From Swiss-Prot:
<dbReference type="InterPro" id="IPR000620">
    <property type="entry name" value="EamA_dom"/>
</dbReference>
<keyword id="KW-0448">Lipopolysaccharide biosynthesis</keyword>
<feature type="transmembrane region" description="Helical">
    <location>
        <begin position="94"/>
        <end position="114"/>
    </location>
</feature>
<dbReference type="InterPro" id="IPR022883">
    <property type="entry name" value="Flippase_ArnE"/>
</dbReference>
<comment type="similarity">
    <text>Belongs to the ArnE family.</text>
</comment>
<dbReference type="GO" id="GO:0009245">
    <property type="term" value="P:lipid A biosynthetic process"/>
</dbReference>
<keyword id="KW-0812">Transmembrane</keyword>
<comment type="subunit">
    <text>Heterodimer of ArnE and ArnF.</text>
</comment>
<feature type="transmembrane region" description="Helical">
    <location>
        <begin position="38"/>
        <end position="58"/>
    </location>
</feature>
<feature type="transmembrane region" description="Helical">
    <location>
        <begin position="64"/>
        <end position="84"/>
    </location>
</feature>
<keyword id="KW-0443">Lipid metabolism</keyword>
<protein>
    <recommendedName>
        <fullName>Probable 4-amino-4-deoxy-L-arabinose-phosphoundecaprenol flippase subunit ArnE</fullName>
    </recommendedName>
</protein>
<dbReference type="GO" id="GO:0009103">
    <property type="term" value="P:lipopolysaccharide biosynthetic process"/>
</dbReference>
<keyword id="KW-0813">Transport</keyword>
<comment type="function">
    <text>Translocates 4-amino-4-deoxy-L-arabinose-phosphoundecaprenol (alpha-L-Ara4N-phosphoundecaprenol) from the cytoplasmic to the periplasmic side of the inner membrane.</text>
</comment>
<keyword id="KW-0444">Lipid biosynthesis</keyword>
<dbReference type="GO" id="GO:0005886">
    <property type="term" value="C:plasma membrane"/>
</dbReference>
């Protein structure tokens, strides 16, 4: 499988896992009768997503050196920032967006190696 596709899949699964963990944390605002059941459901989805991401990560490490693959995971910061705005209405400051732009620039620089 293409290294770029594997990296994208790892990042997407990791992002989904993070969003599910956030959702599980917000379940504690629910009435006590529903809280535990909802939290466990979201945590189970998070564990599955993060577990699949880890398996694909191991496959990616067979194709790329760790010194190249690991910095590319910075794409997770970009995805999580966008998803947090989309799904949770979280706001990012100009400084935050400049950091995201720097991460994207770094990923582009690193991708020339691939």
């Amino acid at each position: 499988m293409n290294s770029y596709l594997l990296l994208l899949m790892v990042s997407l699964l990791t992002c989904i896992g993070q969003l599910c963990q956030k959702q599980a944390a917000q379940c504690w605002e629910q009435p006590q009768a529903r809280r535990l059941n909802l939290t466990l459901r979201w945590l189970a989805i998070a564990v599955v997503s993060l577990g699949l991401g880890m398996l694909l990560w191991l496959r990616l490490l067979q194709q790329l050196p760790l010194s190249v693959a690991y910095p590319m995971l910075s794409f997770n910061f970009v995805l999580v920032t966008l998803a947090a705005q989309l799904f949770y209405g979280e706001k990012a400051t100009l400084r935050h967006w400049l950091g995201v732009a720097a991460i994207i620039f770094g990923i582009l620089l690193m991708s020339w190696h691939l």
